[in-house]
């Protein structure tokens, strides 16, 4: 083995006979080959870390935006909550409307929009005199209802169609 290192005709012997800068370059080449993988792993890890940091910043900004939307929706929901007093008035009003419509022979369809001041959309189908009697009786018996909109439509070959929008007030008039 000693002869291999001392023999000037072996590859190692030829390398030893080279000038000093070739020895240095060879050493740097071997060193770079050894540390290439850890350096590459570090670079990949660093770039992945920056990607994750950017994703995190985007997710945080999205979360902040969604929290602002949620807060806004909660505030709007709080401002539109139906008070218990108004909620207690809705069921008797529904029964009264159904009873009056049946008594006057009107077909009716009603829909409530809930909020601080609930809105009642009422559609009636029947004759004008019966509709007039229905509205007079309803408004006389329900002082908490105020008419926001009243619209009559008369198709050529059908009964009168009436659309009324009422607003339910908190206090009775």
Curated annotation (Swiss-Prot):
Biological-process GO terms, alphabetical: establishment of competence for transformation
Top-rank taxon: Bacteria
Protein name per Swiss-Prot or TrEMBL: Competence protein C
Keyword entries, A-Z: Competence
The encoding gene: comC
Reported function: Involved in transformation (genetic competence for DNA uptake).
């Amino acid at each position: 083995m000693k002869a291999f290192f001392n023999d000037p005709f072996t590859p190692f012997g030829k390398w030893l006979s080279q000038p000093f800068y070739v020895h240095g370059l060879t050493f740097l080449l071997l060193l770079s080959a050894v540390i290439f993988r850890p350096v590459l792993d570090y670079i990949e890890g660093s770039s992945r870390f920056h990607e994750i940091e950017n994703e995190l910043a985007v997710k945080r900004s999205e979360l902040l935006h969604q929290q602002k939307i949620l807060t806004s929706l909660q505030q709007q929901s709080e401002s539109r909550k139906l008070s218990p007093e108004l909620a207690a008035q809705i069921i008797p009003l529904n029964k009264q409307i159904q009873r009056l419509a049946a008594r006057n022979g009107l077909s009716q369809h009603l829909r409530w929009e809930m909020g601080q001041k609930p809105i009642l959309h009422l559609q009636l189908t029947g004759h004008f005199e019966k509709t007039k009697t229905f509205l007079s009786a309803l408004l006389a018996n329900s002082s908490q209802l105020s008419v926001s909109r009243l619209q009559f439509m008369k198709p050529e070959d059908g009964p009168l169609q009436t659309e009324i929008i009422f607003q339910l007030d908190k206090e009775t008039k």
